[in-house]
């Protein structure tokens, strides 16, 4: 039986690197993979997944209204060979129904799905996609990174253009190292309490 996997972490833990490495392992053996990324996440260019260490690959951009089960079912029957695995980067941006659609890809199409994403936002709240994945994924995998103090980083702080901590704002604001810093819970709390 195929499974739905969710590998989660805070920012800068290497989630995209792990995704690209796992996809490469399939491709190196001549297996077909499908990589997905949210259409509005164009930091590496439209329809591209990139890691901070320089690895990158093309991906299919998805929108909130897209039926991912239908997409994978069509691609699997397009004559280009069976899909061996589906990879989703920035999985926190999935909608709850899209997570269920990916579960059906694993359950009904027999294709494993590996989703990688953030668990929580800059306010310590779950993203809807992450919440659904934490609830229904067959396997959960924590990807670890460290705070400046050496402890495990589990939280992220969002910074404004002047480097000041933001406590309010939209949950989704795509950015990289210049906008987000990962901390352990204690140091996240310290930063969020700064005057």
Curated annotation (Swiss-Prot):
Keyword flag Ribosomal protein: no
Entry GO CC: cytosol
A GO molecular function held by the record: zinc ion binding
Subunit structure: Homotetramer.
Main location: cytoplasm
PROSITE patterns: TK_CELLULAR_TYPE
Residues at which Zn(2+) binds: 147, 149, 184, 187
Active site feature: 90
InterPro entries reported in the protein's UniProt record: P-loop_NTPase, Thymidine_kinase, Thymidine_kinase_CS
Binding-site list for ATP: 9-16, 89-92
Family: Belongs to the thymidine kinase family.
SUPFAM superfamilies in the cross-refs: Glucocorticoid receptor-like (DNA-binding domain), P-loop containing nucleoside triphosphate hydrolases
Protein name per the record: Thymidine kinase
Pfam families: TK
Catalysed reactions, semicolon-separated: thymidine + ATP = dTMP + ADP + H(+)
Subcellular location: Cytoplasm
GO BP term, example: DNA biosynthetic process
């Amino acid at each position: 039986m195929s499974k739905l996997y969710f590998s989660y972490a805070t920012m800068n833990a290497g989630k995209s690197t792990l995704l690209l490495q796992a996809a490469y392992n399939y491709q190196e053996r001549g297996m077909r993979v499908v990589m997905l990324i949210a259409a509005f996440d164009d930091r590496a260019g439209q329809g591209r997944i990139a890691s901070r260490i320089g690895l990158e690959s093309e991906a299919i951009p998805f929108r909130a209204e897209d039926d991912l089960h239908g997409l994978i079912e069509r691609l699997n029957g397009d004559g280009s060979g069976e899909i061996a695995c589906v990879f989703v980067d920035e999985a926190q941006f999935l909608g709850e129904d899209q997570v269920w659609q990916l579960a059906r890809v694993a359950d009904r199409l027999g294709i494993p799905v590996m989703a990688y994403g953030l668990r929580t936002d800059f306010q310590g709240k779950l993203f809807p996609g992450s919440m659904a994945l934490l609830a229904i994924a067959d396997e959960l995998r924590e990807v670890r990174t460290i705070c400046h103090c050496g402890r495990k980083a589990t939280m992220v702080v969002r910074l404004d253009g002047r480097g000041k901590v933001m406590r309010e704002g939209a949950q989704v604001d795509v950015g990289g190292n210049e906008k987000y810093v990962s901390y352990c819970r204690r140091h996240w709390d310290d930063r969020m309490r700064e005057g």
